Structure formats: structure tokens, C-alpha cells
């Protein structure tokens, strides 16, 4: 493994916050996704790209099943042949990303969303889409793990805002049926700053 090149303290710190301290780790990240990371400018990205090329590596290509997001996303993102993992990943990111157009299509009409840490209960797709916890200043989200089995799924991770504040979160999902393309009927959401 090779240490990161000199890219300036803000850029190095931004990468450290999301757990990147070796140049090889960047081969699993897209260049456009990296640009969303607060503190990492075009000059630093150019230097990182040159360092990757020197090692015979490059930034990752865009994953065709990953939605375009206004923040840096890293972690357990591959959904391979697990459609419910993709649904959970995409729904969680859509609920967090303020300003991201989302129609609620991954949820049933009478979905129930609970956030016990804020005593919030929302019932119905429209209420969840408009009232779920959405953050405006997300710099990055790291998904630690996504699990799915039968009618249930869960994911947990870490959010870093543009001020550097860390928020740990987890979401638990219940699907309407066991079918692979089933919509979500219940969401339980926890987070701690």
C-alpha cells in the first residue's frame, strides 16, 4: 500500500475522515463522487489521479446502478445479485439527501417511518418523502454494511457534514413481501451525533 501524495492538509483531512489514507483505496471511488467530498478541490483530485496512474490504477468507473448524489458516498455499495440491498441503499440515500428529487417509488402507499430519537412517526408515502430527516450539508456518507434476508433489511453507517460533525445512523426496513422487487412497508431510523 502507498501513502497518499502531498495534496494539502484540507484534502488529506477530508480523505482521512472517510477512512482513506492509501492511494490504492481510491481505485474503488469514482472521480465524480470524490469531487463531492468537502475539502477536496480539483488540484488535489488531479494529483491523486496522476498518483493512481503511476501505480497502474485509475478511479473507478461509474456504477450503473448507483444514483447520482450530491455528496461523497463510500462503503458497502455493491448490490450484485441482491435487489433488496439496492432498494435499501437507494432509499436510505434518497431519504437523507435534501434537494434530491425522489418520488417514493420504493415504498408502499401506506409506509410507516419511525425515528424514535426525535419522536417522529410518518405514515404514508407523501409524508415520508416530505417529512423524513433530510440533511442539507452532507459532505460524505460511508455505508458500513447492508444486510437483507427475507422481508427484512438493514444498513448502518456514518455521515460527515461540511463542518466535520460525525453522525452515526442505522435504518431497518420491512418489505411488503418476500419478492425481490417488493416495496418497503416500514422504516425504523436511528441516528446519534
Located regions from the model:
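Compact, charge-rich alpha-helical regulatory domains located at protein termini
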Residues: 1-71
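Contiguous, function-dense segments enriched for cysteine-driven chemistry
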Residues: 42, 82-86, 121, 126
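Short, low-complexity N-terminal intrinsically disordered segments enriched in polar/charged residues
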Residues: 63-97
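A beta-strand edge to alpha-helix "cap/lid" segment located at domain peripheries
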Residues: 73-76, 129-193
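A solvent-exposed, acidic/Ser-Thr-rich amphipathic alpha-helical stretch
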Residues: 100-149
Amino acid at each position: 500500500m502507498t501513502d497518499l501524495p502531498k495534496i494539502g492538509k484540507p484534502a488529506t483531512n477530508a480523505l482521512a475522515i472517510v477512512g482513506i489514507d492509501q492511494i490504492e483505496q481510491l481505485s474503488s471511488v469514482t472521480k465524480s463522487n470524490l469531487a463531492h467530498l468537502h475539502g477536496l478541490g480539483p488540484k488535489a483530485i488531479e494529483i491523486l489521479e496522476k498518483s493512481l496512474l503511476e501505480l497502474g490504477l485509475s478511479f473507478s468507473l461509474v456504477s450503473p446502478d448507483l444514483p447520482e448524489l450530491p455528496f461523497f458516498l463510500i462503503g458497502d455499495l455493491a448490490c450484485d445479485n441482491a435487489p433488496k440491498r439496492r432498494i435499501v441503499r437507494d432509499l436510505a440515500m434518497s431519504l437523507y439527501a435534501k434537494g434530491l428529487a425522489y418520488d417514493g417509488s420504493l415504498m408502499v402507499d401506506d409506509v410507516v417511518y419511525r425515528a424514535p430519537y426525535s419522536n417522529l412517526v410518518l405514515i404514508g408515502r407523501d409524508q415520508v418523502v416530505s417529512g423524513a430527516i433530510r440533511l442539507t450539508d452532507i459532505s460524505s456518507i460511508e455505508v458500513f454494511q447492508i444486510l437483507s434476508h427475507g422481508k427484512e433489511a438493514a444498513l448502518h453507517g456514518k455521515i460527515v457534514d461540511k463542518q466535520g460533525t460525525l453522525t452515526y445512523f442505522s435504518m431497518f426496513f420491512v418489505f411488503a413481501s418476500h419478492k425481490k422487487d417488493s416495496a418497503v412497508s416500514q422504516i425504523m431510523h436511528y441516528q446519534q451525533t
